From Swiss-Prot:
Coiled coil: none annotated. Residues 180-199 dip into the membrane without crossing it. This is Putative potassium channel KAT5. GO terms for molecular function: voltage-gated potassium channel activity. It comes from the Eukaryota. The chain crosses the membrane at residues 33-53, 97-117, 132-152, 206-226. It is found in: Membrane. It is a multi-pass membrane protein. Putative inward-rectifying potassium channel. Pfam families: Ion_trans (PF00520).
Length: 368
């Protein structure tokens, strides 16, 4: 209920009532900072979960002292024996794969990137680039851990990709094996293929085939996103080039003087350079948030959100013409209705000046 009340706060324009200490408000700064801290833990889980599965020496081993209260029994049921071997086996059997279920938490990171991309305080370009970089690094790390997992779970170590090149690699450090796995993973992802490391058994060959298929999809995704970002960033440049070309062709076709051509080019360049600044100035001149709707109603522009109600209300939708026909006979009610749209004394003068500026711009563009 707290989340719904906070979501409706911006629509009604008033803050929700104070909540109790036992209610978690998702819009408080403390909750947001805690959520950001959880994102850091999610990133650590994304790195540690595959790494602990592939390298047993990297996982921390806790000391647990157990004193059995009963006697040692001989289990003869097949289901009990199977369950015991799954839980207490050398590599914990299938239970080790359940550690990868923590990767489901990555959806929180995906939601974070989706929220940051919509935030105007952050650059959309750098946000997308960081997201693509994180996806690439996670793919490299996950593939390297799978390669290591296949090596340590294969019976004949000499018939693995690292055992055929480096003898007694099990005695080497954890980071040495991980570095070799990342090296092979990144050479496979980059389609370099030096040939020093290669698959030597059927399992490694099958995984290499699946990894290359995933590599083609990931490469297409990255290239498509980067192309979209480059086109988005260079769209204004291409518009300016088209404008310069159009002005040059227009001047040559109509045999305009060189001075007039330079003035037209300078005017166009000034418009593109000050486009962002003029947009900010236009927003400042509009003033309060409700004035936008008032201007739209005065110019008979349909508004998508015209009514907001806090209680059960019956709303009748009529056109601008029918409203004038209903208000004109009742002068007192008409003054009250239209006074809601005109909040300042200079508003009518501002609309008249806006109309004059619109006519001047239309005349200049029609003359050109």
């Amino acid at each position: 209920m707290a989340a719904r009340s906070e979501l409706l706060r911006s629509a009604f324009g008033k803050a929700s009532p104070s909540l109790g200490w036992f209610i978690v408000n998702p819009h408080r700064y403390s909750y947001r900072w805690w959520h950001m801290f959880l994102i850091m833990l999610v990133l650590y889980s994304a790195w540690a979960s595959p790494f602990e599965l592939s390298m047993e020496k990297a996982a921390s081993i806790a000391l647990v002292v157990i004193r059995p209260s009963g006697r040692c029994l001989l289990r003869h049921r097949h289901c009990h024996i199977l369950l015991r071997h799954l839980v207490t086996g050398k590599r914990q059997g299938l239970w080790g794969l359940l550690n990868l279920l923590r990767l489901w938490r990555l959806r929180c990171a995906s939601k974070l990137f989706a929220r940051v991309e919509k935030d105007v305080r952050f650059s959309y370009l750098w946000t997308r680039l960081i997201k693509l970089l994180c996806v690439t690094l996670f793919a490299l790390h996950f593939a390297a851990c799978i390669y290591l997992w296949m090596v340590f779970n294969y019976k004949i170590k000499e018939l693995t990709w690292i055992g055929s090149q480096i003898h007694s690699f099990e005695d080497r450090s954890v980071w040495f094996c991980y570095t070799c796995a990342v090296y092979w993973s990144i050479t496979t992802l980059a389609t370099v293929g030096y040939g020093d490391l290669h698959a030597t058994n059927i399992g490694e060959m099958l995984f290499s085939i699946a990894f290359m298929l995933f590599n083609m999809g990931l490469t297409s995704y990255i290239i498509g996103n980067i192309t979209n970002l480059v086109v988005r960033e260079t769209s204004n440049t291409f518009k300016m080039r088209d404008m310069v070309q159009w002005v040059s062709e227009f001047g040559s076709m109509n045999r305009l003087p060189e001075v007039m051509r330079e003035q037209m080019l300078a005017n166009g360049q000034l418009r593109f350079r000050t486009k962002e600044q003029l947009q900010h100035e236009h927003v400042k001149r509009i003033g309060p948030r409700g004035m936008v709707g008032e201007i739209g109603v005065m110019f008979s522009i349909p508004q998508p959100f015209t009514i907001r109600s806090r209680r059960l209300t019956q709303v009748v939708r009529i056109s601008h013409i029918h409203l004038l026909q209903a208000v004109r006979p009742n002068t007192a009610d008409g003054c009250i209705v239209f006074s809601n749209f005109i909040l300042v004394s200079d508003f009518v003068e501002y609309l008249e000046s806006l109309k004059v500026q619109t006519k001047e711009v239309a005349f200049v563009s029609g003359h050109l």
